[in-house]
UniProtKB/Swiss-Prot annotation:
Organism: Xanthomonas campestris pv. campestris (strain ATCC 33913 / DSM 3586 / NCPPB 528 / LMG 568 / P 25)
Keyword Mitochondrion: no
Region of interest (Domain II), residue spans: 75-104
Record-level GO cellular component terms: cytoplasm; plasma membrane
Molecular-function GO terms, alphabetical: ATP binding; ATP hydrolysis activity; DNA replication origin binding; lipid binding
Similarity field: Belongs to the DnaA family.
Chain segments carrying region Domain IV, binds dsDNA: 323-442
Name recorded for this polypeptide: Chromosomal replication initiator protein DnaA
Binding of ATP, residues: G150, G152, K153, T154
Gene label: dnaA
Cellular compartments annotated: Cytoplasm
Keywords linked to the UniProt accession: ATP-binding, Cytoplasm, DNA replication, DNA-binding, Lipid-binding, Nucleotide-binding
Listed Pfam families: Bac_DnaA, Bac_DnaA_C, DnaA_N
Length: 442
């Protein structure tokens, strides 16, 4: 099928080459009409693809093929694929079939119990727990979790949905990616079934929608979601949404929809700090039954700074190679196995990128940021940039000083300590820091 090569090409641009070669290139795609089956040579690859890549594959295939229903199987693609027979009930009474299915759309693996809490996500975790315990409460309805990709927003959303179902097994909890909402609406329009589409959403107890930034520019989709939102909100049904940025920053979203999204609670999920990253690596290793020494977890946490998905990718690559080779996981083995991945991560966030991002954020010229002038409007952003360089790169203090117009390493050390101290009392500076971390991690 044509869509799979295009999907694979996009995945190659988003994930490390070694991961693509190990987990994605072996897959064979079969289009069965109502779904797409991806065949893997063994169950281990199926497990890795399901855990790490399946949500993104579904998004891309929905975009390229108009079909985000994807199944994984062990084996090889049949030479003469036959479409799956339609269930008799659907064939005889198509109008009775739900436009958007309820069953199986929540991943039960994601719970609050296996979510690793840290300073960067503790407010989001607390809000998701409250939404699950008191669904529909105006204090957190809607609950909007926003932040860069791979930080755990979907995990918290799934965990809240699973907790709702555990408390009330009869609860109708619907999880959708934004593209699925769009596709279901288009299908309802084509089938002249908009009344059924609207009625189905009115019958649920909680609606969870991922990546609402993709509603931008789709006027009819926003119109229908606006009315769906109002009906659920008025009925005190819980709404949980995720977005890759604060909704007011999303161009193409209607002002009235942005206003609705601000009614409840909006929480930023930030990149995890070092301690949280290390805890995540160790927790994910335990889930896989893998023995990971602390110093290896610290190595991965120190080098992989951007998001949880990258941490998991590094861990999975490490465990897979250890299984294939029979070697023990040591620091030396980790450095050897993850060499290209770590190099790419290091190159992604360099001092010039940090300087430009900070200068743009504070509305400064680069020459002013690097100048010898010490006015407060320049000194504070300069200190922030130095502290970010120390936090996000492997450069030494003298190297960072050289990059800032030849400043002494003691100046850099003072800047790092000053920013760390000020952030404890200055909420605005803490907010600036977290926003810059998010921008540099995108």
């Amino acid at each position: 099928m044509d869509a799979w090569p295009r999907c694979l090409e996009r995945l190659e641009a988003e994930f490390p080459p070694e991961d693509v070669h190990t987990w994605l290139k072996p897959l064979q795609a079969e289009d069965r009409g109502d779904s797409i089956v991806l065949y893997a040579p063994n169950a281990f690859i199926v497990e890795q693809v399901r855990e790490r890549y399946l949500p993104r594959i579904r998004e891309l295939l929905a975009y390229f093929a108009g079909n985000g229903e994807v199944a994984l199987a062990v084996g090889s693609r049949p030479r003469a694929p036959e479409p799956l027979p339609a269930p008799q009930a659907v064939a005889s009474a198509p109008a009775a079939a739900p436009i958007v299915p309820f069953a199986g759309n929540l991943d039960s693996h994601y719970t609050f119990a296996n979510f690793v809490e840290g300073r960067s996500n503790q407010l989001g975790l607390a809000a998701a727990i409250q939404a699950a315990q008191k669904p529909g409460d105006r204090a957190h309805n809607p609950l909007l979790l926003y932040g860069s990709t791979g930080l755990g927003k979907t995990h918290l959303m799934f965990a809240a949905g699973n907790a709702l179902r555990q408390a009330n097994p009869a609860a109708k909890v619907m999880y959708l990616r934004s593209e699925q909402f769009f596709s279901a609406m288009i299908r309802a329009l084509q089938d002249k079934a908009m009344d059924q589409f609207k009625r189905q959403f009115q019958q649920i107890d909680a609606l969870l929608i991922d990546d609402i930034q993709f509603f931008a520019g789709k006027d009819r989709t926003q119109e229908e979601f606006f009315h769906t939102f109002n009906a659920l909100f008025d009925g005190r049904q819980q709404i949980i949404l995720t977005c890759d940025r604060y909704p007011r920053e999303v161009e193409g979203l209607e002002p009235r929809l942005k206003s609705r999204l601000a009614w409840g609670l909006s929480v930023a999920i930030d990149p995890p700090d070092f301690e949280t990253r290390a805890a995540i690596v160790l927790a994910k290793a335990r889930e896989r039954g893998a023995e990971i020494p602390d110093d290896v977890a610290f190595l991965i946490a120190k080098k992989m700074r951007s998001n949880v998905r990258d941490l998991e990718g590094a861990l999975n690559t490490l465990v897979a190679r250890a299984n294939f080779t029979g070697r023990s996981i040591t620091v030396e083995f980790a450095q050897e196995t993850l060499r290209d991945l770590l190099r790419a991560q290091q190159q992604a966030i360099g001092i010039p990128n940090i300087q430009k991002t900070v200068a743009d954020y504070y509305g400064l010229q680069m020459k002013d940021l690097l100048s010898k002038r010490r006015t407060r409007s320049l000194a504070r952003p300069r200190q922030v940039a130095m502290a970010l360089a120390k936090e996000l790169t492997e450069h030494s203090l003298p190297e960072i000083g050289d990059a800032f117009a030849g400043r002494d390493h003691t100046t850099v050390l003072h800047a790092c300590r000053q920013i760390r101290t000020l952030m404890e009392a200055d909420g605005k500076l803490r907010e600036d820091w977290e926003k810059l971390i998010r921008k540099l991690s995108e």
